[in-house]
């Protein structure tokens, strides 16, 4: 059998793992890998324009497909440029594997050219990291890395590869491991039957229950089980920002998103609930507000694959450790076998109360304005795409408008940086999604601040012919910063106004793309339809939309209050 070099073993390991795409940027420490990559047609490499873009593309690909995204960067600045993307994936539990080059083993620790301690730098923001010290360790290291990235609570893995490992030859034939065993890592996948029985007993007695679904529902692919459980028990469902689409947006039991900018009915239902069934959530501060005032009358049932997430922020009265899909299936088996549904209590009074909160119409906005409302942009694009598009977003007001006004019916259609809140995520993530689903409509919703963080990836889109639609909600300001300054800092605007902006249309055209400008409400739908037609003809279309700069996102929770403390839009209020 032919002996392989370290770099050849890496490529073969990726092939054996079933990897189809690598997002990367070459440099001296990884040129051996790139040389070996050239000899295979089984893996397509996407040459990005910045390593942060590579990590976000891999991230977007992973979120949309449920598969592992792979990144390849060189040592030193190549590795450090990937850090923001790694942290983004870590905060949202997204499986990516980052392969970073390193200086030769004999030079590590001697401040060699483009040396940095990638293992040390990335340690707080990875699920695990590997420094490969022997060429023969490459296959088992890659096998472990991909298994760790996708098992249990998913997350990013870093594999650091000294240059001398890449051009050395193994003394034994290459063999891809059939299985991997890490004694210290054995995630619990099924819930304890005693805890499940406790949870069901509590739910049976509940008068005002709520199901709170988080991103873990999407990671575990248990949206069908969630829907079945909710319908059997007639319990209202609310989702986190990360879980939009895990429960159909148009379902009558859906209270929509909860949290800082969640709907009035979702937050009120959470506050007054007597039982909360939390599935795959981590109770972050944007969904709890003041933890001391959080859902004061609720018994918390918390299902999560990661035991360290349970009772970390909010104490769980009934903790259930396990894969969310397995646990929900266990609950459903118990309910069905015990004819629990037929004897289930009536929640009529609870639904009447919820309807009274819905009647507040907390997502209302002025539809007769002379200026384009960002809500109108999202609702119009939803209408034109029939709610079937993949939507990626950056971070800010536009992110919240997209989350609130584009009703997602399926999981993995909403791609955003929820935990780290990374500006510059939307465009490269959209390219990763488009690569995975070339026949689907992919839309990046962004703002004039965020889009400039990674706008160079327009070049990548042109090189690989990845037609996406970019909706730039342009208010000439850092919208969410400005909103906070208006509401919390008494209107004192400090460095939130973008005085000098590029001509986005000409900028897009300079990369070879199409550009459309929208300035009035009357032309909004017509020009968005035109943009979609151009998109179907294979063009990336950059739509610059001049929106009402005074528009704020409502509802908005009051700082340090309970879930029920919110600011709502009033008549005439911006």
From Swiss-Prot:
The cofactor note reads: Binds 1 Mg(2+) ion per subunit.
Write out the residues that bind thiamine diphosphate. 51
Pathway-wise, it operates in: Amino-acid biosynthesis; L-isoleucine biosynthesis; L-isoleucine from 2-oxobutanoate: step 1/4; Amino-acid biosynthesis; L-valine biosynthesis; L-valine from pyruvate: step 1/4
Q: What is this protein called?
A: Acetolactate synthase large subunit
Keywords (alphabetical) are: Amino-acid biosynthesis, Branched-chain amino acid biosynthesis, FAD, Flavoprotein, Magnesium, Metal-binding, Thiamine pyrophosphate, Transferase
GO terms under biological process: isoleucine biosynthetic process; L-valine biosynthetic process
Q: Give me the residues that bind FAD, please.
A: 153, 261-282, 304-323
rRNA-binding listed as a keyword: no
Q: Name one GO cellular component term.
A: acetolactate synthase complex
Q: Where does Mg(2+) bind?
A: 448, 475
Q: Which family does it belong to?
A: Belongs to the TPP enzyme family.
What cofactor does this one take?
Answer: Mg(2+); thiamine diphosphate
Miscellaneous notes: Contains 1 molecule of FAD per monomer. The role of this cofactor is not clear considering that the reaction does not involve redox chemistry.
UniProt keyword Metal-binding present: yes
Q: Which InterPro entries match?
A: Acetolactate_synth_lsu (IPR012846), AHAS_TPP (IPR039368), DHS-like_NAD/FAD-binding_dom (IPR029035), THDP-binding (IPR029061), Thiamin_PyroP_enz_cen_dom (IPR012000), Thiamin_PyroP_enz_TPP-bd_dom (IPR012001), TPP-bd_CS (IPR000399), TPP_enz (IPR045229)
Question: By which gene is this protein encoded?
Answer: ilvI
- Any one Pfam family here would be TPP_enzyme_N
Q: For this protein, what reaction is catalysed?
A: 2 pyruvate + H(+) = (2S)-2-acetolactate + CO2
Q: Its quaternary structure? A: Dimer of large and small chains.
| NCBIfam families documented for this protein | acolac_lg
Ranges for region Thiamine pyrophosphate binding: 397-477
Q: Name one GO molecular function term.
A: acetolactate synthase activity
């Amino acid at each position: 059998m032919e002996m392989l070099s370290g770099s050849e073993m890496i490529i073969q390991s990726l092939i054996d793992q079933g990897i189809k795409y690598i997002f990367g940027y070459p440099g001296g420490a990884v040129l051996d890998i790139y040389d070996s990559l050239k000899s295979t047609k089984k893996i397509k490499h996407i040459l990005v324009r910045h390593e942060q873009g590579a990590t976000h593309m891999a991230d977007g690909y992973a979120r949309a497909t449920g598969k592992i995204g792979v990144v390849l960067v060189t040592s030193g600045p190549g590795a450090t440029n990937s850090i923001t993307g790694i942290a983004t994936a870590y905060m949202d539990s997204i499986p990516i594997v980052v392969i970073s080059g390193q200086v030769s083993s004999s030079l590590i620790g001697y401040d060699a050219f483009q040396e940095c301690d990638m293992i040390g730098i990335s340690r707080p923001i990875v699920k695990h990291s590997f420094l490969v010290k022997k060429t023969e360790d490459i296959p088992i290291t890659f096998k472990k890395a991909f298994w760790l990235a996708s098992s249990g609570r998913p997350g990013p893995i870093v594999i650091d590869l000294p240059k001398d490992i890449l051009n050395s030859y193994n003394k034994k034939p290459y063999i891809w491991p059939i299985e991997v065993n890490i004694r210290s890592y054995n995630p619990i996948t099924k819930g304890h039957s005693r805890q499940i029985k406790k949870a069901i007993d509590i739910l049976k007695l509940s008068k005002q229950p709520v199901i709170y679904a988080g991103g873990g529902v999407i990671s575990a692919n248990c949206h069908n089980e969630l829907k079945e459980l909710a319908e059997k028990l007639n319990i209202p469902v609310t989702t986190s920002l990360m879980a939009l689409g895990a429960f159909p947006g148009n379902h009558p039991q859906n209270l929509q998103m909860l949290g800082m900018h969640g709907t009035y009915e979702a937050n009120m239902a959470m506050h007054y609930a007597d039982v909360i069934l939390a599935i795959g959530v981590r109770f972050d501060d944007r969904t709890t507000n003041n933890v001391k005032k959080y859902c004061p009358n609720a018994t918390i049932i918390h299902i999560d694959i990661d035991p360290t997430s349970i009772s970390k922020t909010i104490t769980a009265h009934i903790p259930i450790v396990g894969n969310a899909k397995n646990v929900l299936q266990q609950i459903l088996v118990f309910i069905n076998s015990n004819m629990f549904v037929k004897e289930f209590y009536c929640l009529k009074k609870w639904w009447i109360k919820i309807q009274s909160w819905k009647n507040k119409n907390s997502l209302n906005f002025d539809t007769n304005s002379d200026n384009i409302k960002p809500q109108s942009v999202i609702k119009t694009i939803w209408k034109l795409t029939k709610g079937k598009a993949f939507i990626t977003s950056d971070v800010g007001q536009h992110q919240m408008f997209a989350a609130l006004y584009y009703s997602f019916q399926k999981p993995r259609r909403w791609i955003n940086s929820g935990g780290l809140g990374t500006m510059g995520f939307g465009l490269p993530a959209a390219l990763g999604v488009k690569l995975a689903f070339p026949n689907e409509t992919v839309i990046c919703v962004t703002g004039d601040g965020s889009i400039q963080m990674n706008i160079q990836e327009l070049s990548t889109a042109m090189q690989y012919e990845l037609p996406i639609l970019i909706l730039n909600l342009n208010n000439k300001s850092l919208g969410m910063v400005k909103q906070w300054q208006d509401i919390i800092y008494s209107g004192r605007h400090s460095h939130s106004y973008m005085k000098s902006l590029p001509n986005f249309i000409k900028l897009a055209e300079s990369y070879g793309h199409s550009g459309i400008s929208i300035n009035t409400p009357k032309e909004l739908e017509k020009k968005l339809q035109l943009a979609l037609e151009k998109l179907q003809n294979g063009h990336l279309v950059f739509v610059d939309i001049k929106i009402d700069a005074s528009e704020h996102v409502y509802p908005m929770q009051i700082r340090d209050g309970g879930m029920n403390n919110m600011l709502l839009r009033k008549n005439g209020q911006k």
